[in-house]
Amino acid sequence: MKDRKDIDKKYTWNLDVIYSNTTEFDKDYDLVIDKINSLKKYENTMMDNSDNFYDSIRLSFEIERLIDKLYCYVNLSFDLDTSNNNKQELCEKISNLRSKYSENSYFIVPSILKNDYGVIEKYMKENPLIKDYEISIKEIYRYKEHTLSDTEEKLLSSIGKMVGNSYDTYELFKDCDMSFDSIEDENGKKVELNNSNYSLYIESKDRRVRKDTFNTLYKEYKKYTNTFASLISSNMKELSTLAKINKYNSAIEMSLYADDVDIKVYNNLIDSVHKHIDYIYDYYKLKKDILNLNDIHLYDIYVPIGNSFDKKYSYEEAKDVILKVLEVFEDEYITKVKEALDNRWIDVYPTKNKRTGGYSGGSYDTYPYILLNYQDKYNDMSTLIHEMGHSMHSYYSRNYNDYQNSEYRIFVAEVASTVNELLLSHYLLEHSSDVEEKKYILNNLMELYRATIYRQTMFAEFERDISSIIDNDGALTADKLSNMYYDLNKFYFGNGVVVDDEIRYEWERIPHFYYDFYVYKYATGLSAATAIVKGILDKKENAVKNYIDFLKCGSRLSPIESLKVAGVDLTNSSVADTALDEFKNILDMYKSMI
């Protein structure tokens, strides 16, 4: 692996445009300290008059903006050299600064909520500049009916350290205390199975290896079913109790409230998948036939179908491809993509001690940088266009909004990146003359829809059902959890797949069940992206304009309302229906090529 000094600068991040020297960095750091001290002076006088109110709100966002910039710089720097202790210390320094700000700004929300919104309206008339922060203030008031008295909030805060430990215990136990028997790989070599290499061996072309991997893993999980049942039950009880304390009807309602999402969006997704369950049954039948199996078991599901595809795309070739793919968008979009590619927004190649993987990251006052570890594979090109989607979303969101309205929610975070991925796949399917490449892309797409919509929706249904039991004062025993999970697998895989008994323990190894109703967002994100791409490719009137307007929304609108700007209404089940119909179309295209 190369050292950074051996990489052409044009393939590396330019972080000097953030801070060119330590003096500039220290100046902003000291400025944050000064502003925190200024903010603290308003602790007891914030709501006394419109000027104090304005100064407090303005200062708080100025501090957050500066901390974001500092935090971005130190974290990007650290990710380029994770062995650098000085950079690690800088990360901790800024993390401590963020904590200091939190400690000294805690009074803002309680101070605001002690007053009726009429007071805010009065202050806005006296000082029109306060209207710049109206959306953020209204978001605070949205939680008023779920906010407790000062005494109750302090009491709840004091026990906060005891809440959320279930996940920490779960991770430690699963990753540190569990050990698995060895299996023999394809060459007869003994290898110790673990949670990390399980995915490697469950995709083996050798069915014996897959079966041994599956049975060995779940044999170990079976031993600890009662422990995992206790952990997930504790987590659900914590959520349910917090929901009741904060005046929500259920744990799921509390979790969805953060994104201003109605529970019917969650339930519509599950209903749509149920309506189109036959599509995934057809996919498993196709896989069974291609693998030439008399019967297909759960340990056969993850083996790739078709021949391996190893076409190389150099980074320069990938740049050319994605520019052609993204020509469907307006001039500003393409101009900014070219700037990203040519102006050192992207750190391209793997180097010694560089963070692995890929991401898009930045702040309001920096480029929306992209980290890659490019190695000339198709997946690397796909990662580039995926992360470019994130970065362009960030560009539009920040460029068309003031800081306080510029951060889009996690609920919509994967939409823009997935739109780009889907556009790449459709472009290559249209322009490639290589049948194997087309089959490879179609297989990737089928797996994307299987894993992101069908599998994540099964998880979402399980999570909804077990939380309902706790909300209604029921008990989650090991047997009940395992039986519920097994029955869901029977439905989601159908009669055409042998649903091995061991799968009843799979829920024990899914960390997302501790993420508080998060997984459905993967499915809604892909559903929304599919609808957007369909509109663009079908040249639907204003499809591109509406999509760009969605990218510009930031946090001015709720996630559901911002997607409506793009022409996608997730309160309507037709969005998920369309995505699942697209899965069926992809399946049929693949069948036509074999």
Task: Go through the PLM ranges and name each one.
Residues 1-308, 319:
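A well-structured
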Residues 6-7, 20, 112, 136-142, ...:
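C-terminal, non-catalytic "cap/extension" segments appended to globular domains
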Residues 324, 328-335, 358-361, 390, ...:
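Conserved helix-loop functional segments at active or binding sites
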Residues 408-437, 445-447, 451, 525:
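Post-HExxH zinc-binding segment in Zn-dependent metallohydrolases
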Residues 247, 375-395, 417, 422, ...:
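Active-site recognition of the HExxH zinc-binding catalytic motif
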Residues 313, 363-385:
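Short pre-active-site segment immediately N-terminal to the catalytic Zn-binding motif
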Residues 290-325, 334, 369, 393, ...:
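Long, K/E/R/D-enriched contiguous segments that form extended
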Residues 311-313, 346-366:
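Catalytic zinc-binding patch centered on the HExxH motif and its immediate surroundings
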